[in-house]
Amino acid sequence: EEIVAMYLNTVFYGSNAYGIKAAAKTFFDKEPSELNVQEAALLVGVVNAPTRYSPVRNPERALARRNTVMTRMQQNRYITRGELDSLKQEPIELRYAPISHNDGIATYFREMVRNVLNMPRPTKKQYGRDYEAELARWESNPVYGWCRKNFKSDGTPYDIYRDGLKIYTTLSYDMQEYAEEALCQQLAAIQPRMDAQVKRTGRLFIKTSNEAAERIIQNAMRYTDRYRSLVKQGASREEIEEDFRTPVRMRIFTYKGEVDTLMTPRDSILHHKQIMRGSFMAMNPNTGHVKAYVGGPDFKYFKYDMVKQGKRHISSTIKPFVYCFAIDYMGMTPCTMVPNLPVTLETENMEPWQPKEAGRVEYDGVLHPLRWGLARSRNNYSAWIMKQAKDPKAVADFIHQMGIHSYIDPVNSLALGTADVSLFEMVGAYSTFVNKGVFTEPIFITRIEDRQGNVIASFVPAVSDAISEQTAYTMVQMLQNNVIAGTGVRLRNVYGFRDVEVGGKTGTSQENRDAWFMGVTPNLVAGVWIGCEDQSAHLVTGGEGASLALPVFGEFMK
C-alpha cells in the first residue's frame, strides 16, 4: 500500500498534473476521496500513457481504458458484475481545469520560490558585476538552489513537482490580497494618463531617436514565441517583418480586463510596453518573513518579476543610507546644521559636478538641520555629506553592510541613487532601521516536508549587526519626520496616518522614469516601485514617487 501510495502521489497524469491530488483537481475538480469508481478508474488508466489515454485529447481511448480498469476490478471482486455493466454505460464527465501558473493568488511569488529552489550556481556571464554577491548568497543561503544541493536516498536531486514535497512559505494570504489589490488599483488609475500622453505626443519612448525606438521594438520582437517559431521555420528577415505587421486576432491585456481584438503583433508589443508596471513587497523586519510579494500587474502577460529580478535606479530612497553613514560613522546628528547652498563635487574623472534639485528650489544659504534636508529630499544635503565623507567607497561599503547586495559604483553620484537595486534588497535593507540596527535577510520559506510529513529542511534568516541601536532609532525618527513634514506627508493628509508609528521615503529617478516609496512601521517594512518596462517610456509630468508609489503603500496599510 505504501508503494502504491508513493507511486500515485508522484506519477504524471497529463495536463501538468503530478500526483493523484493534482489529477483529481485538474480533471474533476475534486479531492481524491470524493472521486467515484469510474473517475478513479479513469485516472488509474491514464498513468500508463498520459497522452494516449488523455480524456481531453483522446476521449474514446480514455473510455475504453477506463472500462478495462473496471473490468479488472470486477475480476478481483472489488465491484460486482452488475455494477460493472452499469458503470460501463456512464459517459466520461469532466470538469477540466488544467493547473496554470498564471492563475490564482501570489503568482509571481510562487514562480520566484520555484526558481530559487531550482537555482543553478551563478555564473559571471549571467550576473556581471553582481556575480560575486550572487555567488556568495547561493553558497551561504541554503534556500538558493536547495533542489540542486540536496539529494534523496537514491542519490538523485529533489524534484519539487514529482517528489510530493510540501513547501511552507511565510506569505500572509490576507496581506497578499491587500497588496495585489492596492497595486493594481493604482496602476489602473495611472494608465489613462500614460495613454493620453502617448495619444497627445504620438510617442511612447520619450527623448529617444526613431532609430533607438526601433531597436527597442526589434529587441522585443526577438524575445517572442512568434519570432522564434518563424526563425525555426526558416523565415527571412523580410518575411518576419511582414508577419509582425500583419493584423491577426489576439487577446491583449488592459486594466479593464482582457480584450479580444484585431492587431498586428508589432502593435501588440507597443501596446504592452505602454502598460504601466509596478511591484510591491512587505516583510516583518524582526523575523525577516516576507508577508506580501507582487512582482507585476499580471503574470500571464508580464512574466518579468520586478521585485527580485528587475533592478532600477533607486533615486532618493538611497538617501537614508547616506544620512545613516553620516550619523553612524561621522558622528553627525539630525540637528547638525548645514547651509542651504549648492555643493560642488568631483566626478570619477576629476571634473567638477554640482547636483541639481528637482523642481524649483531656492538656495538661500540659511542653515538647516540634516533632518530638514532628508525630509525635503534635498540633493545638496546628500552631496554635502559625500563631500565631508571624502570617500565614496566607504559609503558604498556601508550601504552593502545595510543589506544591499547589488553593485554600487563608488562615486559621489551614488548619493542620488544612481545604483540599480531590486525592491527585494531595498525592503530588506530598510528593515535594518526598524530592527534596532540588525540586518535580517528576507526569508520566504520556513520548512520543507517530504510526502510522509517528515521535515527534511528548515530555514532561518541570516542576521548581521549593521549599525548601532541608537543610530537605528535616530533614523526611524528621521523617516517618521518625512511623513510628518516631508515628501511623505500625504500618508497623514490623505490616508489619515496621524496616530500611527509610520515613516517613509519617496524616490523619483531622472525624468520620472522610476517612482519609489519605502515605508516602515515597527512590525512591517514595505516598498513600492512603479514605472514602465522600458525606462525611455515614462510619464513626463506627475510621475514622482509621492504621487505614484506612495498611494499603493497607503492603500495597503489601510
Where are the regions that the model predicts?
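Flexible glycine/proline-enriched surface loops and loop-helix/loop-strand junctions
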Residues: 27, 49-55, 160-164, 303-308, ...
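A penicillin-recognizing enzyme superfamily signal
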Residues: 107, 169, 173-189, 219-284, ...
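Short, solvent-exposed loop/turn segments at the edges of secondary structure
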Residues: 19, 38, 48, 64, ...
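Conserved catalytic neighborhood of penicillin-recognizing serine enzymes
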Residues: 33, 97-115, 332-392, 439, ...
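Residues on a specific face of well-ordered alpha-helices
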Residues: 22, 67-71, 107, 111, ...
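Non-catalytic, structured segments within soluble enzyme domains
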Residues: 1-232, 385, 400-401, 405, ...
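Bacterial peptidoglycan biogenesis and beta-lactam-recognition machinery
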Residues: 12-17, 31-33, 37, 71-85, ...
